[in-house]
């Protein structure tokens, strides 16, 4: 499964995000929310959706209203083992790798690597 399956446009709805998360099957249940220029502007998890629904948002609410804007990432040129360890130490396991224009170029899933 490629990282593109984790990308979704901010103009889509909570219902669209639920369908996308359901289609991920056994993958990490995190979506990267992109603007119309394919730049990441937030993340969305099943927990974010649950909180949005509990707070009164409907299935037709757009993702830009409920996404998590303070997401963590690594810049492509700063991709190092030390940075990965820092994320693991903070229990962040699914990390988007961004280019200089905030496009997702790859994703690291630390669940797939053994701890040392």
Task: Kindly label every feature range from the protein language model.
Residues 15-18, 50, 67, 114:
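Generic structural signal for individual residues within well-ordered alpha-helical segments
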Residues 28-29, 40-45, 55-63, 76-77:
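Phosphate-interaction motifs
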Residues 1-7, 45-50:
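N-terminal/domain-start segments enriched in small and hydrophobic, helix-friendly residues
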Residues 7-28, 34, 53, 73-92, ...:
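The conserved cystathionine-beta-synthase
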């Amino acid at each position: 499964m490629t990282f593109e399956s984790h990308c979704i446009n901010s103009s889509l709805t909570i219902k669209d995000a639920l369908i996308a998360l359901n289609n991920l099957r056994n993958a990490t249940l995190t979506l990267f929310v992109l603007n119309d220029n394919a730049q990441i502007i937030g993340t969305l998890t099943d927990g974010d959706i649950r909180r949005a629904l509990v707070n009164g948002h409907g299935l037709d609410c757009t993702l830009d209203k409920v996404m998590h804007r303070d997401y963590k990432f690594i810049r492509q040129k700063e991709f190092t083992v030390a940075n990965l360890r820092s994320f693991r130490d903070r229990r962040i396991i699914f990390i988007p790798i961004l280019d200089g224009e905030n496009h997702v170029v790859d994703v690291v899933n630390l669940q797939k690597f053994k701890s040392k």
